[in-house]
A protein has these predicted regions:
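Gram-negative outer-membrane beta-barrel domains
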Residues: 1-193
Length: 193
């Protein structure tokens, strides 16, 4: 904690609710390993735009943290289990942005202060499967159904608690967000055969 600020102690673990959309790009290469050509290595990047609200409770204060966007770059290693199924693990760097949080005293009455918007840096690790949708009735080829679990851990920071006027209160809320996400998405692979 910043030596000039008094920490407001509390531990908050909550689930976010809302929606998100993802756009990404990457490149995978199938490589032989120990005589097996079923291994896949790749790099990727993705950007998530979202409106996810997470309740925040710290000591006597509560508010609603809103996560607005995130991006990640990383690598993955996978194994082609069948010609249509890839199982993989991934990891890398991530960054996410949270808006200003308006705080109320125990959730009652008017806003008594706020914490500033903040961008967090961190790392992620995850894994999942991709299944080729090789159906003759589909108008395009290279369509996959991906299911992925991703755990992200972000840096620690002290968010200064400011009064509604913007004046500093001398209090800080210690924050270290982490996130768990389960995603199911359609992926189109160009140059897939």
């Amino acid at each position: 904690t910043d030596p000039g600020l008094v920490p407001v102690d509390g531990r908050n673990t909550s689930g976010g609710r809302g929606w998100l959309g993802i756009a990404g790009a990457g490149c995978d290469v199938q490589v032989p390993f120990a005589g097996l050509g079923n291994w896949v290595v790749g790099v990727f990047g993705d950007y998530s735009f979202m409106d996810v609200h997470e309740p925040m409770q710290e000591f006597l204060f509560q508010g609603d943290a809103k996560q607005t966007d995130a991006w990640a770059v990383g690598g993955r290693v996978g194994y082609v289990v069948t010609p249509s199924l890839l199982a993989y693990t991934n990891g890398g760097y991530t960054q996410s942005h949270f808006n200003q949080v308006n705080l109320q005293a125990a959730g009652l009455g008017p806003v008594v202060g706020f914490t500033p918007a903040n961008t967090y840096n961190g790392w992620f690790v995850g894994g999942g499967t991709e299944y080729a949708l090789n159906f003759s009735w589909l108008p395009i080829s290279g369509l996959f159904w991906r299911n992925e679990y991703r755990f992200s851990s972000f840096n620690k920071t002290d968010l200064q608690f400011s009064l509604p006027t913007g004046a500093p209160s001398g209090l800080a809320i210690h924050s270290q967000p982490y996130e768990q996400a389960v995603l199911s998405e359609l992926v189109w692979r160009f140059n897939w055969h």
